[in-house]
Amino acid sequence: MLDQVCQLARNAGDAIMQVYDGTKPMDVVSKADNSPVTAADIAAHTVIMDGLRTLTPDVPVLSEEDPPGWEVRQHWQRYWLVDPLDGTKEFIKRNGEFTVNIALIDHGKPILGVVYAPVMNVMYSAAEGKAWKEECGVRKQIQVRDARPPLVVISRSHADAELKEYLQQLGEHQTTSIGSSLKFCLVAEGQAQLYPRFGPTNIWDTAAGHAVAAAAGAHVHDWQGKPLDYTPRESFLNPGFRVSIY
């Protein structure tokens, strides 16, 4: 099933690129929480929803662009968790650092994940405890790697005081910044060793990247040391967390 989901992410990426390259208008509007949404978000959402309903008609889908109410979700044990365009701010800035995120959740755990970066044409995927990166038609297994000093990857759009204080106390390290779920993927492929997050995220922002990072050997825990959990709950918000090889 992983190959079909990867193809679905590519199809969604193609829909996004039609807007990104100007073939179709961007049509930026603000949602209720003041976050931006574009025609590309909606186009990718439609592609993925249609594809998953065909692929697994009995498995419900939670997408950022049309999340079902709590009364619908509360008893879900297995479901798809989708962010059709993760990094909308990066998309609007046209820096290429945005992704299509698709994850399969089973009893609170992301057991399959796909993160596709359309501009870079790079696909990260994970299933059955293994993670892969596909680039230029070549697919290879990836895993975490230690480095000294460690490289810490941080958000390009969400710096905050807590993060600055954490980095000051961390000891010797280097930092790099990148948008969207690519932060999880840098840890997964051994380029970075730590991704700390204090600012707000939603479950669809993290599930696919979580699957990839965990399958590559990283730990994805909240600041109390518990694994991020995707068991349905009323709020879509995650606690703060860190993705680490340590």
UniProtKB/Swiss-Prot annotation:
Q: Which UniProt keywords apply?
A: Cell inner membrane, Cell membrane, Hydrolase, Magnesium, Membrane, Metal-binding
Record-linked CDD domains: CysQ
The record lists Mg(2+) 1 as bound by: 64, 83, 85
The main location is membrane
**One Gene Ontology cellular component annotation held by this UniProt entry:** plasma membrane
Gene null: resulting phenotype: Mutants require cysteine or sulfite to grow under aerobic conditions.
Q: How is its activity regulated?
A: Inhibited by lithium and calcium.
A Gene Ontology biological process in which this protein takes part is: sulfate assimilation
Q: Give residues annotated as binding Mg(2+) 2.
A: 83, 86, 205
Tell me its EC number(s), please: 3.1.3.7
- Protein name as catalogued: 3'(2'),5'-bisphosphate nucleotidase CysQ
- This protein's species is Escherichia coli (strain K12)
